[in-house]
Swiss-Prot record:
Residues 9-79, 95-163 bind DNA. Residues 80-96 are annotated as: LPS binding (Lipid A). This is High mobility group protein B1. GO terms for molecular function: 5S rRNA binding; bent DNA binding; bubble DNA binding; C-X-C chemokine binding; calcium-dependent protein kinase regulator activity; crossed form four-way junction DNA binding; cytokine activity; damaged DNA binding. It comes from Rattus norvegicus (Rat). Its main location: nucleus. The lineage of its organism: Eukaryota, Metazoa, Chordata, Craniata, Vertebrata. Residues 83-94, 161-179 have a biased composition (Basic and acidic residues). Belongs to the HMGB family. The modification N6-acetyllysine is found at residues 3, 7-8, 12, 28-30, 43, 90, 127-128, 141, 172-173, 177, 180, 182-185. The modification Cysteine sulfonic acid (-SO3H) is found at C23, C45, C106. CDD domains: HMG-box_HMGB_rpt1, HMG-box_HMGB_rpt2. PANTHER family: HIGH MOBILITY GROUP PROTEIN B1, HIGH MOBILITY GROUP PROTEIN DSP1. The modification Phosphoserine is found at S35, S100. It is found in: Nucleus; Cytoplasm; Secreted; Chromosome.
């Protein structure tokens, strides 16, 4: 990914993110010359957040609401630079892209890693999962690969039916075209799958973080 547009509004922050920012500022004031062990610091913040009352969290939730309003207001007036591709519209009724074997593996092991290391960031959790997958034997990967292959097969049937709705000839043409360029299509699909999975993982992690905020 290239560098983003510097004029693009800063992303909105969650109540927990504001809390961590405040903790960091407090730590800097108390220990201006001390270096921070980020992993240890994150863990302490996470533990402290979980013991806070709803009233104590209220201040940070108000900050998050105000920041969300600021972000939405700025995005209304933000004009993307020329040449920047807009994200293609996704029909909510379209069949959902199937997860890859790695994504299925991540879904199974992510909660375990988060439970063992509650202070880890989204990026560190993803890195750990990647290392685990790379160190997994081919035989142990097979159940995930078989499940992913079945889901992909089902998706291809579902998407063909979805695209053929209202276009009777499209299904026939689609089958012939798919046979001719199946390899190319699979490569393109795999690339898109990876992008979608990254987005889905981020969304899942953000949702989980927001759930922690609400507790």
């Amino acid at each position: 990914m290239g560098k983003g547009d510097p004029k693009k509004p800063r992303g909105k922050m969650s109540s927990y993110a504001f809390f961590v920012q405040t903790c960091r500022e407090e730590h800097k004031k108390k220990h201006p010359d001390a270096s921070v062990n980020f992993s240890e610091f994150s863990k302490k913040c996470s533990e402290r957040w979980k013991t806070m009352s709803a009233k104590e969290k209220g201040k940070f939730e108000d900050m998050a609401k105000a920041d969300k309003a600021r972000y939405e207001r700025e995005m209304k007036t933000y004009i993307p630079p020329k040449g920047e591709t807009k994200k293609k519209f996704k029909d909510p009724n379209a069949p959902k892209r199937p997860p890859s074997a790695f994504f299925l593996f991540c879904s199974e092991y992510r909660p375990k890693i988060k439970g063992e290391h509650p202070g880890l960031s989204i990026g560190d959790v993803a890195k750990k999962l990647g290392e685990m997958w790379n160190n997994t034997a081919a035989d142990d990967k097979q159940p995930y690969e078989k499940k992913a292959a079945k889901l992909k097969e089902k998706y291809e049937k579902d998407i063909a039916a979805y695209r053929a709705k209202g276009k009777p000839d499209a299904a026939k043409k689609g089958v012939v075209k798919a046979e001719k360029s199946k390899k190319k299509k699979e490569e393109e699909d795999d690339e898109e799958d990876e992008e979608d999975e990254e987005e889905e993982e981020e969304e899942e992690d953000e949702d989980e973080e927001e759930d922690d905020d609400d507790e």
